[in-house]
């Protein structure tokens, strides 16, 4: 199949298996959820009534005081007591096979092509690391919410994009399922397309 280069009156021949496959929603959902779960720190911790510092003595006698009965100052009902179902550090990561991960990326890229959200250009760069230059370039292309993927990370482009809202610049090694679906448009250089095909072959 062929994809049109926006900045040149020509087309780029690409692999049908990478950019023209059916959308597997279940697979994409599973991989995206697993990717997001893997980003969780999982370090939160609370103390149960067994771990809270405090006396084991019964605060007051069982009957005769007129107050509600109580057996411990560490009760979850009490202020500064333990937590009933205390959170503990845990690993939230989920296993995703390479075949599944690559399949999800291919599925997302193919859907981007179908929805006209993938824009292929011969090259994408700015003369200097100036936000103003990149902002004007994106305005000329009618792009706002965009992920820019280049073959090799362009330092000028990277620095120029840092202060722009909803604009991100990555090289091919830096793309992932979440970033590809998070932006309204994805701009990819011809060099990046070839690298993606090699990576997902």
Curated annotation (Swiss-Prot):
SUPFAM superfamilies: Ribosomal protein L4. One of its GO terms (cellular component) is ribosome. Residues 44-73 are annotated as: Disordered. GO terms for molecular function: rRNA binding; structural constituent of ribosome. Keywords: Ribonucleoprotein, Ribosomal protein, RNA-binding, rRNA-binding. It comes from the Bacteria. The keyword rRNA-binding applies. One of its GO terms (biological process) is translation. Gene3D superfamilies: 3.40.1370.10. InterPro entries: Ribosomal_uL4, Ribosomal_uL4-like, Ribosomal_uL4_dom_sf. The keyword RNA-binding applies. Pfam families: Ribosomal_L4. Belongs to the universal ribosomal protein uL4 family. One of the primary rRNA binding proteins, this protein initially binds near the 5'-end of the 23S rRNA. It is important during the early stages of 50S assembly. It makes multiple contacts with different domains of the 23S rRNA in the assembled 50S subunit and ribosome. Part of the 50S ribosomal subunit. NCBIfam families: rplD_bact. This is Large ribosomal subunit protein uL4. It comes from Serratia proteamaculans (strain 568). The gene is rplD.
């Amino acid at each position: 199949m062929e994809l049109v280069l926006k900045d040149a009156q020509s087309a780029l021949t690409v692999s049908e298996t990478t950019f023209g496959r059916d959308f597997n929603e279940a697979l994409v959902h599973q991989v995206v959820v697993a990717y997001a779960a893997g980003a969780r720190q999982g370090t939160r911790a609370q103390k149960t009534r067994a771990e809270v510092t405090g006396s084991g003595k019964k605060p007051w006698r069982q009957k005769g005081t007129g107050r509600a009965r109580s057996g411990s100052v560490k009760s979850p009902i009490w202020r500064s007591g333990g937590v009933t179902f205390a959170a503990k550090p845990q690993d939230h990561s989920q296993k995703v096979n390479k075949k599944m991960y690559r399949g999800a990326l291919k599925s997302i890229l193919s859907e981007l092509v179908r929805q006209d959200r993938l824009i292929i250009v011969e090259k994408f760069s700015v003369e200097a690391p100036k936000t103003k230059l990149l902002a004007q370039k994106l305005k000329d292309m009618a792009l706002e919410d965009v992920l820019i993927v280049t073959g090799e990370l362009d330092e000028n482009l990277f620095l120029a994009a840092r202060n722009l809202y909803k604009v991100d610049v990555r090289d091919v090694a830096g793309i992932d399922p979440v970033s590809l679906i998070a932006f309204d448009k994805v701009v990819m250089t011809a060099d990046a397309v070839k690298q993606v095909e090699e990576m997902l072959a």
